[in-house]
Amino acid sequence: METWTLEVGETKRTAHVYKPTKKSEGAPPLILAFHGHGGNGRNIARSIALHEAMPEAVVIYPDGLPTRTQRDPEGARPGWSYSELPGSNKDFAFVDAMLAKAKGEFKTEPSRTFAMGHSNGGGFCYALWRFKPDSFAGFAPSAAKGSRFGGPTKPFFIVASRNDTIVPFPEQETSFKDMIARMKMEEQGTKGRITQYANPEGVRMEIYIDGGTHAFAKDSVPGMVAFFRSLL
């Protein structure tokens, strides 16, 4: 693992980067993994270990800045902002900087680039869907809701837990049901905890639901990685 320090405007931003340990055909896949509010890149790397589950990928775990949320109105803890338009949002600019550096170092491509995130980081994934859809091949938000962002039809792997009391499951369910309708998805079947959908154009969505709480569902990682690989 190495740590990048990037100048984004007048702010130094950090991200923790795992290089591929396994060769892939073509450009290496790239995953940006966004922690929840109050977290950091190192902790989410230890928690979900996407770099171990998908060793052929470049996996970047960025650090957020102190950010106001409903649960942290003073903005004392780090997270991600998606309430501002891209031109004034430091986090969107940080994403651009990471994507540019990854392209320069690893020859990554948007068609093989993915964003995942948990809680506040999952909400940020939905914001990227709305404001930077062409930079990503697919998204994997966890414990979040975001259909209000209304981005274009894109592949999604959504993780939700029925006993989540921070982002209540009924609100997450309303969000992904809205996305299913908007993107004209039809159910294709289930595999374990994953329900699969596809639209007439072949764009797919998978929804992983378990009985957990707001904590990240680590058992969702194999399905998430399989979904990413299926898009390459």
Predicted regions and their residues:
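Structural cue for short, hydrophobic secondary-structure segments
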Residues: 33-36, 61, 116, 158
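Conserved alpha/beta-hydrolase "acid-adjacent" motif
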Residues: 165-171, 216-218
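A domain-start/cap signature at the N-terminus of enzymes
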Residues: 1-30, 42-43, 48, 57-58, ...
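Conserved acidic catalytic loop of the alpha/beta-hydrolase fold
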Residues: 93-111
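Short beta-strand/loop motif that positions the catalytic acidic residue
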Residues: 158-160, 164
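Cap/lid segment of the alpha/beta-hydrolase catalytic domain
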Residues: 63-90
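Serine-hydrolase catalytic-loop signature spanning alpha/beta hydrolases and amidase-signature enzymes
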Residues: 38-40, 67
